[in-house]
Amino acid sequence: RKTKQVRTVLDGKYLYSYSDGDQHFQWSPDSKWFLVDYISVGGWNNTDIVLVKADGSGEMTNLTESGYSDNNAKWVLDGKAMIWSSDRAGYRSHGSWGAEDDIYIMFFDGEAYDKFRLTKEEQALLDEEKEDKDKDEKDKDSKKDKDKDDDKKDEKADKPVEPLKFDLANRKDRIMRLTVNSSFLGDAVLTQKGDKLYYCAAFENGYDLWEHNFKENTTKLLIKGVGGGTMFPDKKGENIFLVSGGQLKKIEIKDSKTKPIAFKAEFSYRPAKEREYIFHHTWRQVLDKFYDPKIHGINWAGYGKAYEKFLPHINNNYDFAEMLSEMLGELNGSHTGARYRSASSAPATASLGAFYDNNYTGDGLKIEEIIAKGPLTKADTKIKPGCIIEKIDGTNIK
């Protein structure tokens, strides 16, 4: 940022953007490496995880080497391991799309791997030994004069971040599946100590927030219906923040308590301007991403200008979606189009299963035909073709 120089870390041939926001990468704790979802063995729709050096040298290692989908890699345990999502063990639709995922962990450090696998009792003994050692060192430090102690604090504050060292040759022997069963997964976070995994998973209706405790070997449901979302741990590793469905929640790691975070935000809703932006964004997406650089030889700029003229005359998203579909149809390509479904907050109304006489001009609804096996075909019904429905729930139909 200071020099304003730009360098290529990973060649574009390894990346393919199908939709907005589908590219994932994360900086290492020492700011010298990236974990990136990229195209390798499995093609653009079955990504792998690559470790890439940030200096632009091109040094890279395919960490997963899988024909399955491996994605959403995150550094954990101070860069000594990564967690990621993979569908290698999940149920899948072989005749179509979709598969269940699990969260896995890969260790780049043998000592971190051994420590992670300690039992609750082994960890307690190790913590006790560390406490005794820290106490002895503290007693020794207290005997030193204040000046030397201050110098030591200054040295500690100025201590640079240790560069990460990777034992990649043995990485495949240090892979563990962290989730107890496959599911449709959202985001996941491993705590700083590596003792708990928080993840969003959908088993029934929508995503729920789950916690797995590795030392207790327990899995429990924390929040129902969180709707997927994204999770972020704080710097101290004491809390996790969940952003989902327009809501914020704080999860206290120590006691697994969840609290909502209240906030207020206002924005100026300008639907006409919003549609104008979406129109131009769609046009640019085609220009940037259509498989044929020549766009089938059509004058795409001309079509953009031609359809743009309709924008001032459109006052709803249904007509807007139709207009977008018409413009995209000029491509004569598959899998193109636009649709709009409004989010309804009103209760669903019942369908009686009847066709009505459109030529009837009186009050109410005159039934012309009753659909077979519908609600009006019950044995005890008195409703027949020719009947007029005058009221619904006591309200007159005019």
Language-model regions: role of each:
Residues R1-T3, T8-D20, P29-K32, D37-V50, ...:
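A flexible loop/linker signature enriched in serine peptidases of the S9 family
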Residues F25-F34, A73-A81, A188-D195, T230-G237:
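Blade-terminus and WD-like Trp-Asp/Gly-His loop motifs, strongest in beta-propeller folds
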Residues T3-V9, S57-T61, Y113, R174-I175, ...:
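Predominantly a core beta-strand signature of beta-propeller blades
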Residues S93, A262-E326, E330-L331, T361, ...:
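Terminal targeting/pro-maturation regions of precursor/exported proteins
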Residues Q23, M60-K74, M176-G186, T218-P233:
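Conserved blade-ending motifs and adjacent loop-strand segments that build the rim/top face
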Residues P163-S182:
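A short helix->beta-strand "capping" segment at the edge of beta-propeller domains
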Residues L331-K373, T377:
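PDZ/PDZ-like peptide-tail recognition elements
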Residues K378-K398:
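Conserved PDZ fold ligand-binding element
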